[in-house]
Design a protein with these regions (language model features):
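Alpha-helical transmembrane bundles and membrane-interface segments of multipass inner-membrane proteins
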Residues: 1-162
Length: 162
């Protein structure tokens, strides 16, 4: 069963890398406004989420490798477990690998999705992100949900992979 989850993770990594390649090809000179609150704007992030640890590439590469190895192992060990748990591991793994590829190849992570809000000439901006960041966030939400609500009820409810 693990091979299916690895396959899904690989598809997400490929989509992440494809969108980053498109961003690097088409957003170099100017941003593209899609909606009044959404634009595609190229950014090179040398830090982690919200530019935390900016410039600490080797530390972030090490952390990315450790997290990737951990989630590869966790997926492999899931002979039976909840779909929520497997989804969490798969999404986090895909996001970690997607951003790790960028860090190792380019020294920074390509971000390009930008949500913002303009009110009374003030711009409220959410940090620019990418598909890998979205996968990590959704995976973390699934993992928290699993830890809080499903971990103890899996055996009785039959929400199993096998």
């Amino acid at each position: 069963m693990a091979k299916w989850w690895y396959g899904i993770s690989a598809i997400i990594v490929c989509l992440d890398q494809a969108t980053k390649m498109l961003a690097n090809n088409y957003l170099v000179t100017e941003a593209i406004n899609l909606l009044p609150i959404l634009s595609l704007r190229l950014a090179c992030n040398t830090g982690a989420a919200f530019s935390i640890l900016e410039g600490a590439s080797w530390l972030l590469i090490g952390v990315g490798v450790i997290f990737s190895a951990y989630f590869i192992t966790q997926i492999w060990r899931l002979l039976s477990g909840s779909i929520c748990e497997a989804s969490a591991y798969t999404l986090i793994l895909a996001g970690a690998i997607g951003n790790l590829i960028d860090r190792m190849a380019f020294g920074c992570v390509t971000d390009f999705v930008h949500f913002f809000y303009i009110s009374n000439n003030d711009v409220y901006s959410f940090p620019i992100f990418n598909l890998a960041d979205t996968a990590i966030t959704l995976g973390a939400a699934c993992w928290i949900y699993f830890m809080l609500f499903q971990e103890n009820t899996n055996k009785s409810e039959g929400n199993k992979l096998n």
